[in-house]
UniProtKB/Swiss-Prot annotation:
The chain crosses the membrane at residues 3-23, 36-56, 60-80, 108-128, 133-153, 180-200, 206-226, 239-259. The gene is cobS. Keywords: Cell inner membrane, Cell membrane, Cobalamin biosynthesis, Magnesium, Membrane, Transferase, Transmembrane, Transmembrane helix. It is a multi-pass membrane protein. Joins adenosylcobinamide-GDP and alpha-ribazole to generate adenosylcobalamin (Ado-cobalamin). Also synthesizes adenosylcobalamin 5'-phosphate from adenosylcobinamide-GDP and alpha-ribazole 5'-phosphate. It comes from Prochlorococcus marinus (strain MIT 9303). It catalyses: alpha-ribazole + adenosylcob(III)inamide-GDP = adenosylcob(III)alamin + GMP + H(+); alpha-ribazole 5'-phosphate + adenosylcob(III)inamide-GDP = adenosylcob(III)alamin 5'-phosphate + GMP + H(+). Its main location: membrane. The lineage of its organism: Bacteria, Bacillati, Cyanobacteriota, Cyanophyceae, Synechococcales. This is Adenosylcobinamide-GDP ribazoletransferase.
């Protein structure tokens, strides 16, 4: 029996966006994998959350746990998005005329290193502030981070159209609003679960409620601002959008949920 195309796309997203082993017996397809990136984000965020809970239960210091969790996230994604962040930072620093040339350069510039350092420090600070709320916040941030490129793909031209090895296939095969359907299903499930959690008095219900709304604005604004600045998007800026939205979402959750 032939597997449905959506399942093959999901299998393709699984191995494209992570270093997790491929699914046995299922031939992956890559044309429309971007729509499933938010689902992969939930898986990776879930693994980070699991590591956090295990190490905290083992009485590891929170600062060490935060570092290891961030390191795990970088490894699970194969450094794909962090590489895009550094290349995009170098491109922005080079100016519009030399932007793509700087982003294509295999050498990392000072701006790329600074961007990576700042992002990691901000994520550590947010996780330390969140404390016991960090596991759920990691899930929320990973989801919204992977939603950001969907807006970039829908809204902006691809800067390296036709270039070998580019991520232009994301735009080439996208089918309008259907690309956002998997992400909408997650949000619908969350909106359905929240009232049930309120009934049973689950202590982290406020985190979930805040997370549904907190990530929306950065998931649209970050790719929008990057696209306007760069004159379009590329695979690098897709990755940068993921990392920046993750970081901003963690910070917003840290501020909102620990205020007072």
């Amino acid at each position: 029996m032939r597997a449905p195309l959506w399942l093959r796309d999901l299998a393709g997203a699984w191995i494209f966006y992570s270093v997790l082993p491929a699914w046995p017996g299922l031939k992956p397809r890559f044309e429309r994998i971007a729509r499933f990136a938010p689902w992969i984000g939930l898986v990776l965020g879930g693994l980070q959350s699991f590591l956090w809970l295990v190490l905290i239960r083992a009485d590891w210091p929170t600062s060490a746990v935060a570092l290891l969790v961030i390191g795990l996230g970088a490894w699970l994604s194969g450094g794909l998005h962090l590489d895009g962040l550094m290349d995009t930072a170098d491109g922005l620093a080079a100016g519009r005329e030399r932007c793509l040339q700087a982003m294509d350069d295999s050498c990392v510039g000072a701006s790329g290193v600074q961007a990576l350092l700042v992002v990691v420090l901000l994520q550590i600070a947010a996780l330390l502030r969140l404390g016991s709320l960090a596991p759920l916040a990691l899930l929320i941030a990973a989801f919204w981070g992977r939603c950001a490129p969907l807006w970039a793909m829908a809204r902006f031209f691809y800067l390296r159209e036709g270039q070998a090895g580019s991520a232009s296939f994301h735009r080439r095969y996208r089918q309008g609003w259907q690309e956002a359907l998997p992400a909408f299903l997650v949000l619908l499930l969350a909106l359905t679960v929240v009232p049930l959690l309120m009934i049973v008095g689950w202590p982290s219900q406020m985190v979930l409620m805040a997370g549904i709304g907190v990530g929306v604005l950065p998931a649209f604004l970050v790719p929008e601002l990057l696209g306007r600045r760069l004159g379009g998007h590329s695979g690098d800026s897709y990755g940068a959008s993921v990392v920046l939205v993750e970081t901003i979402t963690l910070l917003l959750l840290a501020v909102l949920l620990t205020a007072g």
